[in-house]
Amino acid sequence: MSDTILNPYFGEFGGMYVPEILVPVLQQLEKAFVEARNDPDFQQEFQDLLKNYAGRPTALTLCRNLTKGTKTKLYLKREDLLHGGAHKTNQVLGQILLAKRMGKTRIIAETGAGQHGVATALACAMLDMPCRVYMGSKDVERQSPNVFRMRLMGTEVVPVEKGSCSLKDACCEAMRDWSANYENTHYLLGTAAGPHPFPTIVREFQKMIGEETKRQILEKEGCLPDAVIAAVGGGSNAIGMFTDFIDETNVRLIGVEPAGKGIETGEHGAPLKHGKTGIYFGMKSPIMQTEDGQIEESYSISAGLDFPSVGPQHAYLNSIGRAEYPSITDDEALAAFKELAKHEGIIPALESSHALAQALKMIKSNPEKEQLLVVNLSGRGDKDIFTVDKILRAKGEL
């Protein structure tokens, strides 16, 4: 491992497993990040953009109807209200400011559900940076509203036709582009995964989610929640929620992986509980692998959770037992999607619906239990309405 300023590992997970040509690029990024973190002017500009462009702080909303007949209080951290429609905007603004600080003149990114792509596109438009987004052709098809949004904001969207035509293939293409153009290009990675220092940078630019939640819940309830719950694909919204609660040992941290069509079918995206540790996407972390070590196809109804690995800090939190990682099926997520829309007037992203489904499962399993739960509603479901409409019609539920 080359010299780094910050620890590149979380326990045994993480690291910087990249072609030698990219090591100095990552070291430059780490140095710029450490300097920016200690620069009041950078922090002031970042905070100003979060407040006056993105719309922070986001609300913490008490569910009025979902918990009727139970003794649970359920709050939603409303990242769906952020400009761009999801938590992704937070760290995108931070990374583009970093890229400008390093003198980069071009941004590339990968996207699955399109939320990271939209966040990157809107921030690049506002901060005047050319932008290219790689997206699996399967995701281009199922997330057409977000593709249109990106193109409308001047971003070049490149459909990736290789492999499973999904997020992991978009990540590989973005990495290839970066390897060829690193001198003028910043790869704006969209989740808390990948080679060091990305997991740390993304966490630091997302941790205001948990910081705000802690302040807001103390103000509203006078105590900390019993559990905070977030969906986990790569893991950025969850680590953003968890970070400020890690040392609060009475607060359960629950990250929800996608069980897809059922763990037993093999069609899922739950590497933490059903994968094996290996090297993938520049890091050491749990991966869905075949017996001979090939990367297995992940699957989820939610494009943003359709990823065969997971961020290294989540792997570490799982290994030491600090966080729990249950999984939720497509059907359970769809049911939660419908319930929130019907009873609270909020349409969640399918990603967030997994976290909500876990909360509902906890509530329904013990309605008499007094508990205070917070779900990170990481994004809104506008992008998913066509997918859900098609599924519900096929099931005869509409």
From Swiss-Prot:
Q: Which pathway, per its entry?
A: Amino-acid biosynthesis; L-tryptophan biosynthesis; L-tryptophan from chorismate: step 5/5
Q: Which reaction does it catalyse?
A: (1S,2R)-1-C-(indol-3-yl)glycerol 3-phosphate + L-serine = D-glyceraldehyde 3-phosphate + L-tryptophan + H2O
Q: Which Pfam families match?
A: PALP
Key words of the record: Amino-acid biosynthesis, Aromatic amino acid biosynthesis, Lyase, Pyridoxal phosphate, Tryptophan biosynthesis
Any one GO cellular component localisation term in the record:
cytoplasm
* GO MF, any single term: tryptophan synthase activity
Instruction: Give the EC number(s) listed in the UniProt record.
Output: 4.2.1.20
* Names of required cofactors: pyridoxal 5'-phosphate
Question: EC top class, in one word?
Answer: lyase
Q: How does it assemble?
A: Tetramer of two alpha and two beta chains.
Q: What does this gene product do?
A: The beta subunit is responsible for the synthesis of L-tryptophan from indole and L-serine.
The record's annotation in NCBIfam families points to: trpB
What protein is this chain from?
Tryptophan synthase beta chain
- High-level lineage: Bacteria, Pseudomonadati, Pseudomonadota, Gammaproteobacteria, Pasteurellales
